[in-house]
């Protein structure tokens, strides 16, 4: 059974995102004093009284404005209400009832989900009761006074919300979904790609650059595996971003890379690889995340039988530090090869979580040493690689024990990394090597202990 969903609905600047952060104990939702800052619906995890649930934050609803985004924001609110068990209608207790509040109340009366009126900006219980009384006029039931900033009344509100959830299936066991972050510059088609994958208009798509300013989380199931897809704000060069909501969205995009299991780096086939694409790729490599490179807008490229191979060669030369990443050419508009993203992303995640026994690691190292001996200094001192062992996953990490790490230059280290990757068949994930100095006698003791363990 899916987690219950709580939808946050209201006009601009009544404190919806602040309440989301309070309910979910996070700072994920963008909080900034500008109408319409939240334009897509964004999901966060909540927990109260032994119940897990999802909180979906929607854009500020307005019914008397002709702005390009407002019809789309209303559509996002509709989609949120369709999946919600409870809708929280947020109003401003200090302003009182407005025409916009009345329009939203009318909008909600035809919806099937349960509705609670939440009167925000009530900074004390006594003040709150007086402010809340006016909102009975909306005809949506009892108003609940709270202060999202200070937390006043939020415990009572959560008690009521949880009471409206369906009964919990105690036998249910849910595995953590694979977290897939869709990363890229503005306007490369990330949101269109997400919509093509999900089969619904999940993120607002517009020709205006930077129209996704939050990270947008979507859960889907594909061939029995649960995925959490994160569509991030387009990431620009830092000096071109002001300290407004876009700045916070970009930083959240970097956070999405950190918490992802696999990143889909989206490149515009018409633009090719830019400096900013290289910086993004470097960030993914730095964080040690599995990665898939998606070349989007392939339908718009004039091509012949050699175009794909030539473009792949060019892209790989510019993203050489992601030479281990799989690449796929797609069109989010036509759906071409979009289905293949799951197969390659699954491969990358599985590879990043793979463990290899110490004996197999050392078989590969022994073969590598046969083909190319460690370097020797001008003074005649040669490096010695004793053995290696895997010490971590996500990404796969190996410690190599040697006589003196400084004897192994960058060229030889890259050679060993390449031999480990090819010999062990790692694809779609970076690997990390740690070079550790060790005395010969300590190595002999280690080998003796390992041999004894095998015999036992």
From Swiss-Prot:
Single GO term (MF): ATP hydrolysis activity
Keywords associated with the record: GTP-binding, Nucleotide-binding, Repeat, Ribosome biogenesis
Function field: GTPase that plays an essential role in the late steps of ribosome biogenesis.
Chain sites annotated for binding GTP 2: 184-191, 231-235, 296-299
Start and end residues of each KH-like domain: 354-439
Record flagged with keyword Protein biosynthesis: no
Superkingdom of the source species: Bacteria
One Pfam family recorded for the sequence: MMR_HSR1
Domain annotation EngA-type G: ranges: 4-169, 178-353
Binding-site positions, GTP 1: 10-17, 57-61, 120-123
Coiled coil: none
SUPFAM superfamilies recorded: P-loop containing nucleoside triphosphate hydrolases
Repeat found in the keyword field: yes
Alphabetized InterPro entries for the sequence: AAA+_ATPase (IPR003593), G_ENGA (IPR031166), GTP-bd (IPR006073), GTPase_Der (IPR016484), KH_dom-like (IPR032859), KH_dom-like_a/b (IPR015946), P-loop_NTPase (IPR027417), Small_GTP-bd (IPR005225)
Assembly: Associates with the 50S ribosomal subunit.
Family per record: Belongs to the TRAFAC class TrmE-Era-EngA-EngB-Septin-like GTPase superfamily. EngA (Der) GTPase family.
GO biological process, one term: ribosome biogenesis
Family matches, as NCBIfam families: GTPase_EngA, small_GTP
PROSITE patterns found in the cross-reference section: G_ENGA (PS51712)
Signal peptide residues on this chain, from the entry's feature table: none
HAMAP family from the UniProt entry: GTPase_Der (MF_00195)
Protein name in UniProt: GTPase Der
């Amino acid at each position: 059974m899916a987690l219950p969903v709580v939808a946050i609905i209201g006009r601009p600047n009544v404190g919806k995102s602040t309440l989301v952060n309070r309910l979910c104990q996070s700072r994920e939702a963008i909080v900034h004093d500008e109408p319409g800052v939240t334009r897509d619906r964004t999901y966060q995890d909540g927990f109260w009284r032994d119940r897990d649930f999802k909180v979906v934050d929607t854009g500020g609803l307005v019914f008397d404005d002709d702005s390009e985004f407002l019809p789309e924001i209303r559509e996002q609110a509709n989609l949120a209400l369709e999946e919600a068990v409870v809708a929280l209608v947020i109003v401003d207790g200090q302003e009182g009832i407005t025409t916009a509040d009345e329009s939203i109340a009318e909008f909600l009366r035809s919806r099937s989900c349960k509705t609670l009126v939440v009167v925000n900006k009530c900074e004390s219980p006594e003040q709150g009761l007086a402010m809340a009384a006016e909102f009975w006029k909306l005809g949506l039931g009892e108003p609940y006074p709270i202060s999202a900033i200070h937390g006043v009344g939020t415990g009572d509100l959560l008690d009521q919300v949880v009471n409206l959830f369906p009964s919990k299936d105690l036998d249910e066991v849910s595995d953590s979904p694979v977290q897939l972050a869709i990363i890229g510059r503005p306007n490369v088609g990330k949101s269109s790609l997400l919509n093509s994958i999900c089969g619904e208009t999940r993120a607002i798509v517009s020709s205006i650059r930077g129209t996704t300013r939050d990270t947008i989380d979507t859960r889907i199931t594909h061939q029995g595996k649960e995925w959490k897809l994160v569509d991030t704000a387009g990431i620009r060069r830092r000096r071109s971003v002001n300290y407004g909501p876009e700045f916070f969205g970009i930083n959240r995009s970097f956070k999405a890379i950190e918490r992802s299991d696999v990143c889909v780096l989206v490149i515009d086939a018409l633009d090719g690889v830019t400096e900013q694409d290289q910086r993004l790729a470097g960030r993914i490599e730095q964080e040690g995340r599995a990665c898939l490179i998606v070349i989007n807008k392939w339908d718009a490229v004039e091509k012949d039988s050699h175009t794909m191979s030539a473009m792949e060669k060019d892209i790989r030369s510019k993203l050489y530090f992601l030479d281990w990443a799989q690449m796929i050419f797609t069109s989010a508009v036509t759906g071409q090869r979009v289905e293949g993203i799951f197969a390659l992303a699954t491969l990358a995640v599985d590879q990043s979580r793979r463990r290899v026994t110490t004996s197999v690691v050392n078989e590969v190292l022994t073969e590598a040493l046969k083909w190319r001996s460690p370097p020797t200094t001008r003074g005649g001192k040669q490096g010695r690689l004793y053995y290696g062992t895997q010490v971590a996953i996500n990404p796969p990490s190996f410690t190599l024990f040697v006589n003196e790490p400084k004897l192994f230059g960058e060229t030889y280290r890259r050679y060993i990394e390449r031999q480990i990757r090819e010999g062990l068949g790692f694809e779609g994930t970076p690997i990390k090597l740690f070079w550790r100095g060790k005395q010969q006698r300590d190595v002999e003791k280690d080998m003796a202990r390992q041999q004894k363990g095998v015999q036992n």
